Amino acid sequence: MTPASQTNFVLVGVGGQGTLLASNILAEVGLSAGFDVKKSEVHGMAQRGGSVVSHVRWNTGAVYSPIVGRGEADVLLAFEKMEALRFAEFLGPGGTAVVNEMEIVPITVSAGNAAYPGDEHLRRAAVDLGARLLMVPGERLATEAGNVKAANVVLLGAVSRLLDVSEETWMRCIEQRVPAKYLELNRTAFASGRAAVA
């Protein structure tokens, strides 16, 4: 997929996963690539492990609203599998879901009152929506890079393969957003995410 006149992103995760940092980097990348960009965030109970949702829109013309409607997302970037299922309806036909393989088990599941949905649910949702599903082992790749907290940058690396924006632009924007002492870690994490969907 390459950016047409407009590219819509929905990023979803759980508090503490770096969803908002990822959306800020994605917005910076769009601006650096010459797009008009709008972004919105819903923090929910982010500090307590609740859902975090961010919408980002790139457009070659003006973006008038940051909100991505249901069925309009070109890319759904999910930092956790159940969050991917909860927000799958935002994906449009021909879109791509980039999903971290991480599972954060909610209390209802750990208490035995519900079952955590398996990967087949994600695959079926993607097929039903006419979308593509890319599963990425974000935590494993981030750990191999040096720190599990870099999983958000691993996932951005995977997303970068879908877009016609140079790797140098991505890295420049990442470098502007992360502390200098973590630059090498994040370079490695980004490269491993790109390689995961090559």
Segments predicted by a language model, with ranges:
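Active-site cofactor/cluster-binding pocket
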Residues: 1-198
